[in-house]
Amino acid sequence: IDDTRYDYLWSSRSVVKNPYYNGTTNGGFYGVDVWKYADDVVRPHLQKGMTAYYEIVGFLPNGGAIQKLGGKAFDYGFEPPKGEYKYGENFGVQIYRLTYTNPDGRVYEFSARQVQQWCVKEGLKPVEEYYYGYAKDLYPDLSVSEHWNENFLQRLASDKNFFMECESPTCNNKVPHEGIVIKIENSLSEAYKLKCIKFLEGESKSLDKGEVDIETES
């Protein structure tokens, strides 16, 4: 007898936000359930066994910023709501990872390219892809036999093509670009963040003032 039941769960990091499965949940860090609004956007596109991982960007239903630094909102081109809270106007969803779990519990990891293609097919927005290929081909002038790892990271950390140490290319407000994520194509969920120094400095100043972001809170 197959007693498997499929249903929808939405969560933030390790905390289930769906009130039907977590009766103790509330507005959490933000005081409002922005995760349910994002789930309403993504849910219609998921098949049984699929899990979508994404960033929610822009503003909250109460007008607060989802992400801010030094009092400035990372608006990502969105506007605070003046009435009905709307996807595409007040907030957005950017998908960065997809998995499929089969009935036996085995997990299949979508490649970074497949995530991009799936989002295009479904009319959803993936995270911005700046480069796809071998790391060694990004800077062919760097010798792979002479401290390549250190030289590669040093070059990447200041590469204006990726807006490193620049203002955010997607925000109307003048806020520092957060950085980039390097995703390794190895059928595993293996990714590394390279944050901009300007962003880290702003983050440190905010912490000194007692301002805590959602990642620190979690």
Model-identified regions with their sequence ranges:
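Core nucleotide-handling region used for phosphoryl-transfer chemistry
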Residues: 1-218
